[in-house]
Amino acid sequence: MNRILGLDLGRVRIGAAISDELRLLAHPLETIPADAQATARLAEIVREKKVDHVVVGIPRQMNGRIGAAATEALQFVEKLRAILPCPVVTWDERLTTVAAHRALREAGKNTRATRGYVDQVAAQMILQGYLDRRQHVAHAAGNEKWDSQ
């Protein structure tokens, strides 16, 4: 089974996480500079890691509205959809970066020194939330093979 790629978009860096082959667990993958080569690197990852599905976190405002950061993220999603050979879906990522900072602090990590890793952990949280939701929906529908949805 192919993997799912999760992305935490930022103006400076893009955190990437990848699922295991069973699509149950998300793992930090890498941090990519948010520059002109970012889409090419993501296309490379999709090819190398046999990704057939990409989940992009959209930073909605706390009231659920789409702000400037979410608008930029949605524009990037459209660029990805134009170049990637697989579906690109969006996922609400409110407070994942805050949660990633907290998790790293609680693990005794200096988040300033591991700035790029915070983005990977945020991407991992986005992807894990997506994987958990898919599994929950499939289980509630009585599907043993939740990936068929």
Regions found by a protein language model. Give the residues of each.
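Phosphate- and other anionic-substrate recognition elements at nucleic-acid/protein interfaces
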Residues: 2-7, 11-12, 17-149
